[in-house]
């Protein structure tokens, strides 16, 4: 395990140490353009194994900054990043497509990202649970906060742009197995694996 700070301008020492261990695969935990620096450093030092990134790297910045060095990278993602590649019967296809259309109309083509998709999904959840909570309690009270919690935990299967949620008292993660995708950088773009 090696660490780096967002403000670091080089991760050469960490990359050399990791490459010398010759693991089959490595996981980079960083976001956006910051995920490109360690990835590039590993490739530049001759690493040939698989390099995986977290969902936080599922932005165009990874490819913009990483260039050819991030070709073949694996990234976990929710469907909102690549709705065009989802099969027609995927539960999130419609909402993911709607999210991308609305987001890119305001911020420009190719600017979609995981984080904006999660904000869109938060609105979907709030639109479902707030009416329930408002029937149970007055906003601004402890009872209202409890009513929101209870409504979320009992909202049932809810399709969002990043997959399907099904919260419960025991499951605050919420996402079902229909959610996650593995993307690979191929020719400077995302491809569902």
Predicted segments with their positions:
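Extracytosolic ligand-binding ectodomains
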Residues: 1-193
């Amino acid at each position: 395990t090696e660490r780096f700070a967002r403000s670091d301008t080089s991760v050469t020492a960490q990359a050399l140490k990791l490459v010398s261990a010759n693991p089959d695969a490595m996981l980079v935990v960083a976001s956006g353009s910051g995920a490109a620096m360690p990835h590039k450093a590993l490739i530049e030092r001759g690493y040939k194994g698989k390099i995986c990134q977290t969902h936080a790297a599922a932005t165009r910045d990874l490819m913009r900054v990483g260039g050819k060095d991030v070709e073949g990278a694996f990234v976990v993602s929710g469907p909102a990043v690549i709705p065009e590649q989802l099969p027609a019967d995927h539960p999130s296809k419609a909402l993911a497509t709607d999210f991308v259309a609305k987001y890119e109309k305001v911020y420009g083509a190719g600017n979609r990202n995981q984080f904006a998709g999660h904000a869109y999904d938060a609105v979907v959840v709030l639109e479902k649970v707030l009416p329930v909570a408002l029937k149970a309690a007055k906003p601004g009270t402890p009872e209202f906060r409890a009513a929101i919690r209870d409504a979320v935990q009992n909202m049932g299967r809810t399709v969002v742009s990043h997959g399907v949620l099904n919260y419960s008292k025991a499951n605050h993660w919420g996402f079902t197995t229909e959610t996650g995708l593995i993307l690979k950088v191929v020719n400077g773009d995302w491809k569902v694996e």
